[in-house]
Amino acid sequence: MKILAQLLSTLVLLSVAGQTALAQNAPQVRRVVTQVNEAGKAVVLFDDKIDLSTLRSPNPAGDVWITQQFPLNFSQGADWGKTHVGVSPGKNGTLFRIVDFVPTTEKIEKLPLDTMMKVVADNAPKRGMPPRHSMMHRTRTVDYALVLSGEVDMLLDDSEVHLKAGDVVVQQASNHAWVNRGTQPCRVAFILIDSQEP
C-alpha cells in the first residue's frame, strides 16, 4: 500500500509540476443521467458537470458512471458517478470514464517502466508481456474507447496505432499505453467492463 501511495504521489507531483495550467483549463464534461420515476415517467436524475482531475495520472480524468454488479440494477436516485474505484471497475462492474490525454513530457517518459502496472496492481491479468513504457498497463477488462477529439498513439507490446477523433478501439485485457505526442490534448471516452482472466 505504501508503494502504491508513493507511485500515486509521484504521478500527482509530475502532473502538478508539468500540467497544472492545462488541467485547470480542461473543460468540464456535461453529464445527463435519466431514470424512470415512481409514476413510470422518464425523467432527468442528474444534469451536471464532471470536473476532470489529475488524481490518478498526469492526465485529467472524470468518472461518469460506475456499476458494481451484474446483471445491472438501477441507482434509485443515488449518484453512482461518485463511487470510488481505481483504474478499473470492481468484480462484475463497469466504469464509464472521460480522459484528456495531455502532451507527454520527458519526465513521464523517464519514469520506471512498471510505474502504471504497479498502480493497477491486483487488477492486472496474470498473462502478458512486461511493460515497455511507464504508462503501459493492462486491466482485467474489456474496454470500449472512442476518441472524441485530438490524436493519440496507443502503444502495444511491439507495435503502436495512431488514433484520431472518431476512431474506436475494443481492447481485450491487452498491454497498452496512451501517449500523446502532439501539442493539443486528446479526449477519449472509455467504458471498462470487468472480464474473466484472459
Locate the predicted segments by residue.
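A short beta-strand-loop-beta hairpin characteristic of the jelly-roll/cupin
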Residues: 130-133, 137-139, 144-165
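Ligand-binding loop in jelly-roll beta-barrel domains
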Residues: 94, 151-153, 160-165, 173-197
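Conserved short histidine dyad/triad with adjacent acidic residue
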Residues: 49-51, 97-139, 172-175, 194-196
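Positively charged n-region of N-terminal signal peptides that target proteins for export
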Residues: 1-5
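Bacterial N-terminal signal peptides
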Residues: 6-18
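Boundary at the C-terminal end of the N-terminal hydrophobic targeting segment
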Residues: 20-23
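Double-stranded beta-helix
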Residues: 25, 30-32, 36-37, 42-46, ...
